């Protein structure tokens, strides 16, 4: 007898085939039958009117630290994610020598905006090597499965010490050691290696990260570990200032290792055609038999701004900045004072404070046409009429008056799309989502605690692209499900999941598609040391099943902890 039979749902099995009705049977953590009418089971779940999909496989998170203190891995678990991969963007916490722990926390804070006090309180540091780190992850109970990649920054600091932090060139011996560490990581189950080559990744002091200037000899030398072991992918984030150089070494990496190479791709205001040039290069590489892939986001990556967030238009005004150390409720109480409002609105941005900001953050003080109000549920494809500049023009107010009152009086968050919104709509994203050379990722779960929360991306993909979009064509649900199940699983070699077919791991979502909606992001204080972060919930998930065990029912955790560390090269994963 089966353990569970899900009866009469609309099955979208993750393969891309058309939806069909039927049952899904589960026994011993595996799917035993899909479709038709199945026999009795110890538990039967009525899925009439529900969509039945594989659990989401999210391959771009930053739960490297949170996986040590949070068995849920929220918010991802609230959105049907059953497998989360971290170690992205070259940042992580292993390997590490004791005297470099602070440096790695600084790098994680600078790159992914996870505060130092949170990391200091939450990390146990019961490891030095990457195998030690994997063992520490494996010892913990958790709700969903996790998978790790080896990150460049910690291994560069481990091998080179302060020379890495000063971004000195790696010697041949340095490269050999990093290659050995990477091979060791792959053998104990890392799914690949990642690095960062972007100026947007800096330490809290504004210094570029240790891997920023690594040359092709270093990258190719480390990458050769992938061909030695015969496993893993090579991932990279770059500004592509020298496109020819970057593409040349990526092609060489793919050719010499025979392993998949991927990079992060978005459109950018400063170079709207860059993404097209890069995709042309990807297709050319593929035509030459090379495995080169662009990892993309399914919506604009944008910063939310309000009271208590990492940034808002008034954080560079002296009077406002003086209040930032106060509790959020007290900040708002004072900001509601009409006299204080007049004083802040009359102030000019502090030039010294502005100079400390990145180029993007400087835009936040001036580009009122790029600020948008958010609804509940939030609208991630707002039209130009929703911008602060447009509202100000219609109502005969100044833009900063509109922004101040929205943030303070209405206690709301403004949305500033950083990338993927050059055209003011989602048409570029739609083109990317239709390109088989693109892989869906970039949810960034666990990162950018007080500025971004994109971990609800799986729910957004279905609700927005499959049902709610009004400013352009929608996409088929079968395509959207495949994009975040079998495609992501297959790319990284997670060969036992991502499809509802017999023999596969029984990771399943039951979704009331008509009710599926994202909530407005919420700022909460639930991290170690009282740290705050944005979270975002969703309605519509009737149940999420992991390894054949219900872990969430109607949005509530059942108490079950079937999650584990998935190791590449073990149990058939490669």
Question: Model segments located where?
Answer:
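Acidic, glycine-enriched loop/beta-strand segments at the rims
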Residues: 12-23, 415-423, 429, 476-479, ...
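Histidine-rich, glycine-flanked metal-binding segment
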Residues: 1-5, 11-55, 521
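C-terminal cap of metal-dependent C-N hydrolases
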Residues: 431-438, 443, 455-457, 510-562
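Short, well-structured alpha-helical segments that form the helix of a local strand-helix-strand
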Residues: 401-407, 476-485, 500
